[in-house]
Amino acid sequence: MMPIRDGQPAPRGASYDGKGVNFSLFSQRAERVELCLYDDDGVETRLDLPAHSGDIWHGYLPAVRPGQRYGYRVHGPWQPQQGLRFNPAKLLLDPCARGIEGEVTDNPCFQSGEEQPDTLDSGPLAPKGVVLADDFDWEDDTWPRVPWGSTVIYEAHVRGLTQLHPGIPAEMRGTYAALGHPVMIDYFQRLGITSLQLLPVACFASEPRLLRLGLSNYWGYNPLACYALESRYACGQNPREEFQQAVKTLHQAGIEVILDVVFNHSAELDENGPTLSMRGIDNPTYYWLDGQGNYDNWTGCGNTQNLVHPEAVASTLDCLRYWVEECHIDGFRFDLATTLGRTPEYRRDAPLFQAIAADPLLAQCKIIAEPWDIGPRGYQVGNFPPPFAEWNDHFRDTARRYWLHGDFSNGDFARRFAASSDLFQKQGRLPSASLNYITAHDGFTLRDLVSFEHKHNEANGEDNRDGSNNNFSYNHGVEGLKAPLLVTEHRRRSIHALLTTLLLAQGTPMLLAGDEHGHSQHGNNNAYCQDNVLTWLDWKHGDRGLFSFTAALIHLRRRIPALQQDRWWQEGDGSVEWLNGQGRQLNRLEWEQGVHRLQIRLSKQWLITLNATEEVCDLVLPPGKWHAVPPFAGEDNPILLTVWHGAAQGVCVFQEKS
């Protein structure tokens, strides 16, 4: 091998220029950095990075080509109480590696040490970075740029979405390639969604505790390397190229791809967790530590990344730009996003927020926050700055309690239906900032929400202690999926009411994959470690009628101007009227204490009627010629009504025609 040259400090990671590879690694406190190259037989060659510019260590190797496996051994003091955990016995993964080979196992060689550094060499078993070439042919691919007002998000897991799909070749099921298969493209288009939001696809690890139980991390919220695609979702040898092709195909169909990204913590867990990467590279820079060198655990995952440091801001921004530039991603959903704004207290003007807002490339992307973590003042719904949209759990809980428990007033329901203006109508934010959902990957599926009163998480190995107990679910009198026909009919009505609320409310709707055809996880509301038929969508036995109902609602949403314009509804502008059961405007008493019967008139010619009571009732429609529309009546046989005979827990939509 040729002698290593000084190289350049940028870009971060391993960059192939057609002649060789530049290696660049940040470490403010390191005393020496060894680049470790591995051949096909696992033989290691060590080379000191010869130069460092400020806190960036770097070197260039002319002889190296794409496919090269590599890692780092970083030398420095071992002073855990000061947060310094350098240990050259541990091979460290490049945080900016574009490709990864190998998986983390439950092996003692990954332990760093306590009073003294552990001397077991992790090199033979540690995951390695892989050098990649940026040579994918995007041809004339363009980002769909779906307006926020027209956006309908579909949250899905790469494996779970297609693992059991009979229309996809067996070798392709559960992979990136399956996302772009014609069967799935056709399905997305018939359903009507505009944006596919994927649970984490960046490389992640399974926690040692799960491995000991014979389980694995299924969701992927345990990140190992945020630039690299998870190889277990690839059916071929090149995960990134396979993913790029899927994105390209989805774009050709006009469908956006949004990634769930995890920058709040890492797979290194707490002080007793494995040393895999950042802990051994520059622990005090990458993580929030207390005065004794222990990790601040504001994420519930053992550690919390420090995203105030200029290097952390720069590398996070670079990672986001990488996904947009190299993989043509359309947007990001940030897991536990309060952590991104910690300084360590939460600030709307935190450095990373300002950097995202100022970046011209990211300004064209959809930016979504999960607006909480478990740290001090971690709940920040409505308090994120533009351009963030936010998961609105107020919408979720109000919709569930209004329909399933008879809680909240008509006014409370209307406030959430109108994009939660009390939370989001500030600092120039638009209604689309309220990302509305009834269910998500975390919690009950929609079918389980109306079938189980209690969680059933025994399979997770924690004696049913994990998962939320505050689900606001209702089993309609029978626990579990099997129930008498009358109970099944009541559940169907509740599902229809909740879907109608979600898909015809102002704001940005997000639908959980599988809810549109009745997927169940049999009462498990925390299936993060269930990579099996419990979480994989059952396509053979899906409820086709429910799919048709959901698709019709999405297509109906497109026809209602008040839901497409992404501007706040104002009194008297014709966007909305709130009416009682007699077709008259709600008075104050009905607004605050009235029975749960409501009519919502949108854009003057559309009328949504709701009966969220347990009794059949008649609602007098406002003056006009009102025709029930699909999915509440057939296209060829619209029903003309002046009074709606509303079933208990019933809903209907009408259009006024001259």
UniProtKB/Swiss-Prot annotation:
It catalyses: Hydrolysis of (1->6)-alpha-D-glucosidic linkages to branches with degrees of polymerization of three or four glucose residues in limit dextrin. The active site is at D335, E370. SUPFAM superfamilies: (Trans)glycosidases, E set domains. InterPro entries: GlgX_C (IPR040784), GlgX_Isoamylase_N_E_set (IPR044505), Glyco_hydro_13_cat_dom (IPR006047), Glyco_hydro_13_N (IPR004193), Glyco_hydro_b (IPR013780), Glycogen_debranch_bac (IPR022844), Glycogen_debranch_GlgX (IPR011837), Glycoside_hydrolase_SF (IPR017853). Disulfide bonds: none annotated. One of its GO terms (biological process) is glycogen catabolic process. GO terms for molecular function: glycogen debranching enzyme activity; hydrolase activity, hydrolyzing O-glycosyl compounds. Keywords: Carbohydrate metabolism, Glycogen metabolism, Glycosidase, Hydrolase. SMART domains: Aamy (SM00642). The record marks D442 as: Transition state stabilizer. Its EC number is 3.2.1.196. Pathway: Glycan degradation; glycogen degradation. Belongs to the glycosyl hydrolase 13 family. Removes maltotriose and maltotetraose chains that are attached by 1,6-alpha-linkage to the limit dextrin main chain, generating a debranched limit dextrin. NCBIfam families: glgX_debranch, PRK03705.1. This is Glycogen debranching enzyme. It comes from Erwinia tasmaniensis (strain DSM 17950 / CFBP 7177 / CIP 109463 / NCPPB 4357 / Et1/99). The lineage of its organism: Bacteria, Pseudomonadati, Pseudomonadota, Gammaproteobacteria, Enterobacterales.
